[in-house]
Amino acid sequence: MKKRIDYLSNKQNKYSIRRFTVGTTSVIVGATILFGIGNHQAQASEQSNDTTQSSKNNASADSEKNNTIETPQLNTTANDTSDISANTNSANVDSTAKTMSTQTSNTTTTEPASTNETPQPTAIKDQATAAKMQDQTVPQEANSQVDNKTTNDANNIATNSELKNPQTLDLPQSSPQTISNAQGTSKPSVRTRAVRSLAVAEPVVNAADAKGTNVNDKVTASDFKLEKTAFDPNQSGNTFMAANFKVTGQVKSGDYFTAKLPDSVTGNGDVDYSNSNNTMPIADIKSTNGDVVAKATYDILTKTYTFVFTDYVNDKENINGQFSLPLFTDRAKAPKSGTYDANINIADEMFDNKITYNYSSPIAGIDKPNGANISSQIIGVDTASGQNTYKQTVFVNPKQRVLGNTWVYIKGYQDKIEESSGKVSATDTKLRIFEVNDTSKLSDSYYADPNDSNLKEVTGEFKDKISYKYDNVASINFGDINKTYVVLVEGHYDNTGKNLKTQVIQENIDPATGKDYSIFGWNNENVVRYGGGSADGDSAVNPVDPTPGPPVDPEPEPEPTPDPEPSPEPEPEPTPDPEPSPEPDPDSDSDSDSGSDSDSGSDSDSDSDSDSDSDSDSNSDSESDSDSDSDSDSDSDSDSDSDSDSDSDSDSESDSDSDSDSDSDSDSDSDSDSDSDSNSDSDSDSDSDSDSDSDSDSDSDSESDSDSDSDSDSDSDSDSDSDSDSDSDSDSDSDSDSESDSESDSDSDSESDSDSDPDSESDSDSDSDSDSDSDSDSESDSDSESDSDSDSDSDSDSDSRVTPPNNEQKAPSNPKGEVNHSNKASKQHQTDALPETGDKSENTNATLFDAMVALLGSLLLFRKRKQDHKEKA
């Protein structure tokens, strides 16, 4: 069976297509599936200074049809939507009475150069959501922003299918992706909790080094506000802080003031600046004329904002303005849901706050005992250094279930390879795998510390279990597992400007039954967009305040009184972004949550024909106790020629143990031609006292033809439970051993005086009946249905009682899924005894009679020879 890890949208061949509307955009979602996964994606983005956030949850009921993958109608519910538009850092400057020439000479305008055009957001077609883009008009310069939009498409379709070889993959890139099987079709789903996009952001010149004087003592902050104090960071949630500031007295170029964040909060979100000197550029504070009043940066390590005044402020005083900055969770310092202190220091003045993080759970999957469960999160994207790296955390089996034949696929795309900038390959991707000791200690934020004692690195054990044979896909064979694993991904994306889309998939079966194929998937996407902002710093011009904060006082009053409450503007209709000169402020918080599920069960039926040839090996254990006293006078001359031909073909198994203690005196001349394999171990205790003088002339010709029927009775108790799936023809040759135990007690007393010259001819036809009793106890694991037709021939020449030992028979492991036909056949054979074909009583009498005649003849012969010996003496 071939499975595929993709699906293409808008393919109506044999798949149902549903139309639904999210926000103001209508999109079509087609559920053609690679790997059996119906991806239902969403978009999200984050803003640094100008941010729009919307959250939508979509859910659907389970649906299933034979060999048809249908995506149910999604019921779209718009949740609380808050839009913060055009948050702009601004300043208003009151100047002292100076000449215009002086003011002009001390005033400069600094604008960062921009050489690249602003990347336009890549349209995400045929998805479950459409991101709204805010149209912002900036007078002179646009600063980068990160739009946050989150959509949750929960489309759970659980299917029990009977699929063979679920790990087989096929990854064509151009044809519709399907997954089907003659015995069932899997219809999983993908949950997309948060989607982000990533466009290459051109590095922005950082703020000037703070070489001047710290003027925190001259800066007063007021009207501090948090946009919200509770949100879900795993659903692209974040908040904004807004405050007014006023500079008392005069400052000069190079002077600066600071703002510091607490441990539980960050200003960069999930954008990684570790390759950019851990410094993130912040939008400049500008005047209405576009003059840069102050340049700002954010230090990732110290969580400190630094606002450095430019020479614009020289010879000016009473500068006042405002700023609004996005705040995100610190996944390492706030790993669990809860309320954290968020006390923010602005210009050495503390503003006490508390923020509640309501992380959506990373433990997600199919709600069945053997259901696949996996989730992932992009926790860091380098947008500034040009190295184009990202970091991703994957939780494998977070529900800690017992799963069989588990495979995990980490993809650098979702629907189509050409629609993502992700690069997954042996050279572009580094994987580290950890075994989790205590699943309850996993973070809600997807943060995983490699040095955590709760994580045991087992990457070396997967050296030969990681492959990249499919384009842009890493395949990991976890096999049979009952523990949770964390996979840390260090990947790359290209410079095409496309969104970074990733997908993780887990598939497995129920190890107890070998059926119930289950699959679950998870989507992530990152987008960094560009926005703009403006500010005012010239006292001669009334500022325009596009931000939802307190307005800047346009008049040069010594005590400006700003409005106490920021009021956000109405949400604009989604229109394409203009192409401003980008000064990126890529603050993004990357989180996503997606899942796909499917279940399938398989049952196999096989017919088998079996031919068996058996070769018997008989082992006889005889014990006789003979006490004879004879006085015989005979003269015999015996010439015996015996030709014996025995052929035994028996289906039995025996072990023989014999101990022989024999005290005998015999003289025999025999010629035998025997085609049999016999191992005889006799235990005989014979005490014979014979005084025989015999003279006999005997000519005997004997022909013996024996035919034996073997009657075996076996009792077999087998318990089988197996994972088998095949059609097989088997031929078997069996060697059997028999164990016979015979005991005879003979007491004869004879006295004879004979002189004979006999000429005897005997024709002997013996029929022996062998009774074998075998007790076999076998235990095996098998779950199969098979019809077995076996034909065996057994022909044995033996006079024995066979008691084979207990045989423990165990069904062999069946890695390829073939049905073990021997279980059922052997069980039937062991419980049905062979029919009796001989007459036991007659055979026994004939045997005793032959033994007595042979004994009498030997006594007469012995006596005759003894007598001849005496006469010669």
Swiss-Prot record:
This protein's superkingdom? Answer: Bacteria
Q: Which Gene3D superfamilies does the UniProt entry name for this protein?
A: 2.60.40.1280, 2.60.40.1290
What PROSITE patterns is this protein classified in? GRAM_POS_ANCHORING
Place the motif MIDAS-like motif on the sequence. Answer: 272-276
Cell compartment(s), UniProt: Secreted, Cell wall
InterPro entries annotated for this entry?
A: Adhesin_Fg-bd_dom_2 (IPR011266), Adhesion_dom_sf (IPR008966), Fibrogen-bd_dom1 (IPR011252), LPXTG_anchor (IPR019931), SDr-like (IPR050972), SDR_Ig (IPR041171), YSIRK_signal_dom (IPR005877)
Give the residue interval(s) assigned to the motif LPXTG sorting signal. Answer: 834-838
Positions carrying Pentaglycyl murein peptidoglycan amidated threonine: 837
Reply yes or no: does the keyword Transmembrane apply.
Answer: no
Query: Where in the sequence does UniProt note compositional bias of the Low complexity kind?
Result: 96-119
Does the record carry Secreted as a key word? Answer: yes
Q: Site annotation (Cleavage): which residues?
A: 197-200
One GO cellular component this record assigns the protein to is: extracellular region
What does the protein in this record do?
A: Cell surface-associated protein implicated in virulence by promoting bacterial attachment to both alpha- and beta-chains of human fibrinogen and inducing the formation of bacterial clumps.
- Protein name from the UniProt record: Clumping factor B
- State the species of origin: Staphylococcus aureus (strain MRSA252)
Upper lineage:
Bacteria, Bacillati, Bacillota, Bacilli, Bacillales
